[in-house]
C-alpha cells in the first residue's frame, strides 16, 4: 500500500515534472499501432477493488485531472464487502477518467490446483474467473476493457495463450517499460507502493527507457 501523503507526493511530481498521464487502454493501443506517445508518457494503475482508492486516491487524481485504471476482483464487490468499492463509486470515478478492468472474481493463485481438483476442473475454474468479470464489468459499467492483471502476477504459457486468443492484454507484476516489442500477454509495470514508494526510486523508474534485444 501507499499512504495518502506518499501518493500526493507522487502525483505532484508527475504534474510538476510535466509527465503526460494517459488512459492505459489508449496508451497501449497507440504503442501497438506504432504511434508515438507524448514525451514522458505514463499510465497509473491500481490492483484490487479496495475502497480506499475511492476515499483517498480518487480525490487526489480528480484534482489533477489524471486518468487511471483499477484492476478489480469482483467477488468482494458483489458480496457488498465494505472494504471494497461499490459499483456506484466506480461509476462516479468513470466520469472523471477512471477505467475498470479484469483482476478475476476471487483473486486466486491461477497456477495452483485446489485439493483434489483435476487439471480439467482447474482450467474451467480459471477461465470462468476471467470471463465472469468481463460480464460483470459490461453489465455494471457498460464496458469491459480487454485488459487483465494476473493475481499475484502469476501466469503460464497456457493462460497467456488463452488471454491472447480472447484479445486481452495481460499484466504481470515484474518491473519494466512497455514498448511495441513487449509481450502483450504479460506486460510489466513498475510498483510504487510499500517498499517501492520512495519518490527517489520512483523518479528513476519513471525516467526509464526500453532496451530492446536484437538477434
Question: Where in the sequence are the language-model features?
Answer:
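N-terminal pre-catalytic segment of deacetylase/amide-hydrolase enzymes
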Residues: 1-42, 189, 197, 204-215
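Conserved beta-strand termini and adjacent loop/short-helix elements that scaffold enzyme active sites
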Residues: 24-27, 71-73, 103, 173, ...
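Acidic, His- and aromatic-enriched active-site or binding-groove loops in soluble protein domains
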Residues: 46, 167-176
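Short, electropositive alpha-helical surface patch
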Residues: 154-171
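A cross-kingdom marker for long, charged
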Residues: 155, 175-208
